[in-house]
A protein has these predicted regions:
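Alpha-helical membrane segments and immediately flanking helix-loop junctions
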Residues: 88, 96-102, 117-127, 131, ...
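Alpha-helical transmembrane segments
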Residues: 167-185, 295-303, 326-329
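Intrinsically disordered, low-complexity non-transmembrane regions of multi-pass membrane transporters
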Residues: 1-19, 25, 75, 189-218, ...
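Membrane-embedded hairpin module used as a gating/binding unit in multi-pass transport
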Residues: 175-251
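N-terminal alpha-helical transmembrane segments of multi-pass membrane transport
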Residues: 1-74
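Transmembrane helical segments that form the transport core of multi-pass membrane transport proteins
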Residues: 223-307
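Transmembrane alpha-helix boundary signature
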Residues: 60-80, 97-109, 131-142, 282
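Entry/N-cap segments of selected transmembrane alpha helices
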Residues: 107-129, 280-307, 358-362
């Protein structure tokens, strides 16, 4: 009987109930709330669901992220190995390849001025960088946090891993993902505040047709030019353009379909669960998380405002031919930001079709955010 009682006592004490802190229970509730949003309200479920489940797992069973050096048998936790793919920049780069395979750069090629709007929207990144320095973060942490301003989830993870700021990767990833999802809520008030009714009603001329040759040359030329100037961008820009070359060449249909579908979804599962697993109670429930979330919001708002204001400048310089609303699409939340430009423009004039014009700055923003990340890597000597 004593043996049975002792065995039962050991089993009971090995349950998670005896090993978790109040913080773990808080994070379990947060994870369940995120799962509710993903399943019941379909709030960007492709990423939110695996992130939330990773968050749930690590706060119930922290050893699922156990480092091999701390394991009795030398084997790390399952999600630790998933996470190493984030840390080594493999998963974010593969995400970029999938995005490239799904992206049509035609609107950007047809209107190269869109590059300027995409660049202007990156202002929020550098505003957040100096804000983070002011709040007491060191320079590398500030750089990792600032990329949230581009509303680019994979790039945020990529830079945080490259700069060795894995301790704050969870809050950065959650903030970046949240603002990417909240584009339709955050952007419209800023866009309406900074533009007049007359400006919002401006109709832009139809974009010129883009030839197949131009579409094939674009990823090759961008890779050569950008990577020669800033070699540190090669993992992101290179993979983005490789995926796009798959799409536009027309000779590797199977690779295009795999990169944009099967491989993309596999990577999203690995990326989402591993990033969610970085949000343990110890890493997430602290003052720095609140600072990161606040900085991310400020950065995103600054980026949106900078894009719109630069759009207004281009409107004046073009004699009223450019609608400033497309400037807000310069953040790299593709295609949500472009759809918001279309929606806000249609509210002033239902016959105004801005979507294709906004896609130019939108895809330029993807390149711009990758370049900003590469710039920080070059500054800090990280390759």
């Amino acid at each position: 009987m004593e043996y049975i009682a002792s065995t039962l006592n050991n089993l009971i004490h090995q349950t998670a109930f005896f090993n978790l802190t109040w913080g773990n229970y808080v994070m379990i509730l947060v994870a369940c709330f995120f799962l509710y949003l993903a399943i019941r309200h379909e709030f960007e479920p492709l990423l939110l669901l695996p992130i939330a489940f990773g968050m749930l797992l690590v706060n119930i069973y922290p050893d699922i992220m156990l480092h091999p050096e701390n394991a009795a048998n030398g084997a790390g936790g399952l999600l630790y190995y998933f996470y190493k793919l984030d840390e080594l920049a493999i998963l974010p780069s593969l995400i970029f390849m999938g995005v490239g395979a799904m992206t049509d750069f035609g609107p950007l090629i047809a209107n190269p001025k869109s590059f300027l709007l995409g660049a202007a929207a990156q202002f929020g990144i550098f505003a957040a960088y100096f804000g983070a320095i002011w709040l007491g973060f060191n320079d590398k942490a500030a750089a990792a946090i600032s990329i949230i301003g581009g509303a680019d989830f994979p790039t945020s993870i990529f830079l945080a891993g490259k700069l060795g700021k894995t301790a704050i990767l969870g809050p950065i990833a959650v903030a970046a993902y949240s603002y990417m999802s909240l584009v339709p809520i955050i952007q419209p008030p800023i866009m309406k505040l900074l533009t007049t009714e007359k400006e919002r009603k401006i109709k832009m001329g139809q974009l010129r047709p883009v030839s197949k040759l131009e579409k094939i040359l674009f990823p090759i030329v961008v890779t050569i030019v950008v990577c020669l100037i800033l070699p540190t961008t090669a993992p992101l820009v290179g993979m983005l353009m490789l995926g796009n070359l798959f799409r536009e060449s027309g000779v590797v249909r199977q690779l295009t379909e795999t990169a944009s579908n099967a491989l993309m979804y596999i990577v999203v599962i690995l990326l989402g669960t591993s990033v969610g697993a970085t949000t343990s109670a110890e890493a997430f429930l602290n003052a720095d998380t609140l600072k990161i979330v606040a900085l991310g919001l400020i950065a995103f708002m600054f980026g949106t405002a900078a894009g719109v204001l630069f759009g207004k400048l281009m409107c004046v310089m073009s004699g009223g031919k450019i609608n400033p609303l497309i400037g807000s699409a310069g953040v790299s939340a593709v295609p949500m930001a472009a759809r918001v430009s279309q929606k806000v423009g249609a509210e002033s004039d239902p016959t105004n079709f801005l979507l294709m014009h906004a896609m130019g700055p939108n895809v330029a923003g993807v390149i711009g955010t990758a370049v900003a990340a590469g710039t920080f890597m070059a500054i800090f000597g990280v390759f």
